[in-house]
């Protein structure tokens, strides 16, 4: 698609592409902080309810939101997540609930670049090439919208 072709203007740094967890979440965040404009962790959870896509938002807890680097970056994290969900919704992807679920994650606790963990489905979700293309198109649209392109 045209949205997907534009993504090649940005470089994607794949930190992990399987279940091998040689690098922990802090190490992945450090890599992203030093080498990326944003950090997007793509996940398919282990449930079988086919509930749809959503992002892990920063919890609305004052003690957490007042801790650095969260204090300086939580709004960027949530804005990136909302933009990705909007892009996915626009591509016709099923969205869970309001599109977000509050969760205290290591990734957002240590990130100084916009960083989000997004669940794209689960074991019951369709994993066909056409669905993966649809997810990719939605994510590209969300990234482009976030960066104002």
Predicted regions: what they are:
Residues 2-149:
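Active-site-proximal helix/loop segments of hydrolytic enzymes
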């Amino acid at each position: 698609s045209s949205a997907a072709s534009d993504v090649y203007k940005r470089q994607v740094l794949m930190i992990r592409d399987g279940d091998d967890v040689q690098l922990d979440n802090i190490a992945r965040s450090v890599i992203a902080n030093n080498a990326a404009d944003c950090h997007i962790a793509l996940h398919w959870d282990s449930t079988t309810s086919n509930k749809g896509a959503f992002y892990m938002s920063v919890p609305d807890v004052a003690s957490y939101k007042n801790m650095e680097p969260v204090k300086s970056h939580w709004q960027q994290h949530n804005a990136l997540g909302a933009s990705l969900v909007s892009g996915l919704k626009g591509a016709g992807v099923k969205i869970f609930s309001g599109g977000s679920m509050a969760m205290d994650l290591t990734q957002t606790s240590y990130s100084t670049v916009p960083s989000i963990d997004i669940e794209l489905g689960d074991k019951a979700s369709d994993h066909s090439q056409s669905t993966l293309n649809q997810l990719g198109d939605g994510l590209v649209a969300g990234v482009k919208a976030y960066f104002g392109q």
